[in-house]
Amino acid sequence: MTVRTRFAPSPTGFLHVGGVRTALFSWLYAKHHNGQFILRIEDTDRERSTQESVQAILDGMAWLGLNFDEGPYYQTERYARYQQVAQQLLEEGKAYRCQCSKERLEALREAQLAAKEKPRYDGHCRNQSLPDSGIPYVIRFRNPDGGIVSFHDEVYGDIHVDNSELDDLILVRSDGHPTYNFAVVIDDWDMKITHVIRGDDHINNTPRQINLFKALDAPVPVFAHLPMILGEDGKRLSKRHGAVSVLQFKELGVLPHALLNYLVRLGWSHGDQEIFSVQEMITSFDLKNVSRGVSSFNYDKLYWLNQHYQKSDSPESVANALQWHFEQAGIDLNQGPDLKDLVAVQAERCKSLAEMCQISQYFYTDTIEYNEDAVKKHLRPVVLEPLMVLHERLKALDEWKNDKIQECINDVSLQFDLNLGKIAQPLRVAVTGSGTSPSIDMTLALLGKNKSIKRLEDALEKIRARASVV
């Protein structure tokens, strides 16, 4: 048997991290078993489905590298198939037309609630054999009267539901559109899905779907339902917790494989291992180690993983991802150091690519913004003479290399009997605008000689101006 899994999002909003984890687990299970992963867009909600959401799903999957073997399939392109199967079920007596009005159904619901009963359809039209007479109707599934629906969930174990708890669900609405529970069964059947891995909010749908599979003499897939992801406050993950859309994490500067590594550990474990390459995930993943407990999304842990990959990945690969952030900021990368050289010195200083871009822009701009507090603290008249001497020493360098730069700084600090920091910090503020940067020799080396000398000259003018005011 070829394992076939699917990811079936609805394009009614952004691609949520909970959906991404579902996609990841389905993708990993298929890859682990040398199977196939299918993408299906469940776009039957005509009012809420948008092309923008479809594109966000496709872009998010592409960014994460969750490639699909088939698809994307669209439910709106399969309406004829749903109608065909609905007609087949009608002809076989496994479904029936229901002409109950909204008013009758609402009155039934209110009466059941008043009697403290579970609201459910009472089968009023079940045995009436109503013809297609032009009166609006829905098509309902004739759920078995007795017996128990039993299935083994790969996460939650054996589940049993009495058919008396299930009413006759609607398959096709009066406007001809299929319901979710009907369309998803036909799709999984036609697409030969062997394993349905999805959120545990679908557990209650499963007995109904199993009955429908059996009515169609279709093979019933294996089910695995994944527990919910919560925020750290124990509430359902939402925008108030921070980024929840996969593409927001890209904007925040999270590497795609760092996000995958983090998500795979939300509800799944492989011993005590925390760090997984994508290939290690594929090799190790199984469903038996998926936890039944809910998971909490911890942003600090995600950024810890992200920084790990920033440091352990090759500078070239990190630079490729970092380039997008500079492009979004409108920074011309031709005006500064090679990105891979920047990554080599900044990766361990930043928790994300967005932060790395933000604190490194001075390497690529002609002018810099000075932090006024840093200027007041470090660009004082007392450092004017040492910086003037350092300016001449640096300007005279034939080789603009770290060791030569550091040698100049050391010599000037000795000449003026100053602690090294008393020279390095004013120099840092002069060339970066702030009091934080990589080591000062590395900072100047990356900036290049011309830009470093020009900024030092500008800072000297700033100090002279302050001195004249004083």
Swiss-Prot record:
Note the Gene3D superfamilies from the entry. 1.10.10.350, HUPs
Question: Which reactions fall under this protein's catalytic activity?
Answer: tRNA(Glu) + L-glutamate + ATP = L-glutamyl-tRNA(Glu) + AMP + diphosphate
The enzyme's E.C. designation = 6.1.1.17
Supply the PANTHER family for this chain. Answer: GLUTAMATE--TRNA LIGASE, GLUTAMATE--TRNA LIGASE, MITOCHONDRIAL-RELATED
Please provide the Gene Ontology terms (biological process) for this protein: glutamyl-tRNA aminoacylation
Q: Name one GO cellular component term.
A: cytosol
Q: How does it assemble?
A: Monomer.
Its protein name is Glutamate--tRNA ligase
Organism name: Legionella pneumophila (strain Lens)
Which compartments does it reside in? Cytoplasm
Q: Does the keyword Transport apply?
A: no
Motif span ('HIGH' region)?
Answer: 9-19
Residues that coordinate or bind ATP: K239
